[in-house]
Amino acid sequence: ENEAGTKATGSLVTSFDNIEIDSKIKDRFTLIKDENNHVIGNCQINIYLWYSSYFGDSLTACRLSIYELNKRLNEEEAYYTNINPEDYYKQSDLLGTKAYTAVDLSVSDSIRKLDTYVPSVSIRLDQAKAKKLGQKLFKADRKDFYKAFPDLFSGIYVKSDYGDGTVLYISQVQMDVVSIEYVTDSITGIKLKSKVNAEKDSIQYTGRTFNSTREIIQANRLANDTEAIQKCIDNSDWTYLKSPAGIFTQVTLPVRQIAEKLEGDTLNAVKLGIPIYNETSDKKFGMSMPRNVLLIRKKYKESFFENNQLSDGVTSSLFTQTSSTTNLTEYTYNNITKLINDCLKAVSYTHLT
């Protein structure tokens, strides 16, 4: 993940020295001081990886590490799954590690079954890391804080470094910066007393939340067993669909033969069917058959994804399984006439793709 989209949920303004609270709570917050050793705030920083679902074994022990990026990703550049994360972080920039399972058994069944429950993997930055980032945040100009945030914090790299057989489908990454402050009168600024203990000032939690959104770059690194992939590619009896990284499956359409047979006639309908072979793997957890398959002309494959285009029936055609398709044995593109006609326009060229 790189620079985050942001949403304000409070403010980071407080004096922490003399706040009298439970020591267990106070220990979770880091004092932030300026260059003159004066306290300018306090904070607790948590990072959450929310996921909508998962694949594989729900109880496989896994671990991830989160690193701070040392430079921003270029918003004008397209990043592919062969991106090298080491170009953007150092081992010393570790923010934290977390062991987890896809199903968190520390959460009660009654909570996990709620419609509002969303599972997550979270880490809390230690005192040293929270202090380093907190100093940047508290010294920032409050008026342009959100604009300045990407320059203060370039983003994170999440690395899976232990366990296999489980994939989390991350839907959102969130960083919460929480602090404790006195509750004051909005007009006079005088500290308000606690309703529980009138001898103590009232305190509250406040903070800001920074979310990853679709508008910012979320680049994924995928690596494959090259020898195993090559064996699949070398198979002459069938091919595999393995995307977005793995096997670049190509289909050749007889456009020249179609053009020769037409001889000026109009092409009304073209149907393409690609047979599906049954999976014979005996693995306990196997990925389900793809329900959506994109057929795209080779010449457009880079621009299609880099420009975030949608299937238009001309440069590409999308197969989507419907509820009426009970037994999926073939990917059927019922009408790719527009795509073929677009190819026919270039039939005079020496090579078609």
Q: Residue locations for each model-derived region?
A:
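Beta-strand-rich interaction/scaffold domains
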Residues: G56-K131, K284-T332
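A short beta-strand-loop element at or near the start of a globular domain
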Residues: E1-Y54, C62, V118, K131-D144, ...
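Conserved small/polar residues in nucleotide/adenosyl-binding loops
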Residues: T350-T353
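Long, contiguous, structured domain-core segments that constitute the functional module of a protein
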Residues: Q204-L344
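Exposed low-complexity, polar/acidic, P/S/T/G-rich flexible segments that act as propeptides
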Residues: D164-E215
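Coil residues (strongly favoring Ser/Thr
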Residues: S58, D109-S110, S186, S202, ...
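Aromatic- and glycine-enriched pocket-lining scaffold segments that form the walls
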Residues: R112-D185
